[in-house]
Amino acid sequence: MNLIAQLEAEQIAALGKDIPDFKAGDTVRVGYKVTEGTRTRVQMYEGVVISRKGGGIGASFTVRKISFGEGVERVFPLYSTNIDSITVVRRGRVRRAKLYYLRDRRGKSARIAEVSNYKPKADAKA
């Protein structure tokens, strides 16, 4: 392990975040801290993960949802201090790592089949 990877691993461990195992196609609910004036509250954002990018401390993921008939995408840094929680709502069965084609789909063609027999990876934290 090189020095940069070691430093990133130490920073991730110092954050102490419990990140669930999720990938593109999964539906997640992200609790994001929003500051309004002096008050801070947690806003839930639920949608389909259409991509995960990067590795280490700079990793991010993109979540897409349909809000009032319009598609809305939001990019979240995975280890951001503003992320309160990440919950996997359902597991999707897809054959791509990036689901950008969902931007052009509407209705039934934009649906993702659910995985019924999901088993977490052996090396992932349970």
Swiss-Prot record:
One of its GO terms (cellular component) is cytosolic large ribosomal subunit. One of its GO terms (molecular function) is structural constituent of ribosome. InterPro entries: Ribosomal_bL19 (IPR001857), Ribosomal_bL19_CS (IPR018257), Ribosomal_bL19_sf (IPR038657), Translation_prot_SH3-like_sf (IPR008991). GO terms for biological process: translation. Keywords: Ribonucleoprotein, Ribosomal protein. The keyword Ribosomal protein applies. It comes from the Bacteria. Pfam families: Ribosomal_L19. PANTHER family: LARGE RIBOSOMAL SUBUNIT PROTEIN BL19M (PTHR15680:SF9), RIBOSOMAL PROTEIN L19 (PTHR15680). Belongs to the bacterial ribosomal protein bL19 family. This protein is located at the 30S-50S ribosomal subunit interface and may play a role in the structure and function of the aminoacyl-tRNA binding site. This is Large ribosomal subunit protein bL19. It comes from Paracoccus denitrificans (strain Pd 1222). The lineage of its organism: Bacteria, Pseudomonadati, Pseudomonadota, Alphaproteobacteria, Rhodobacterales.
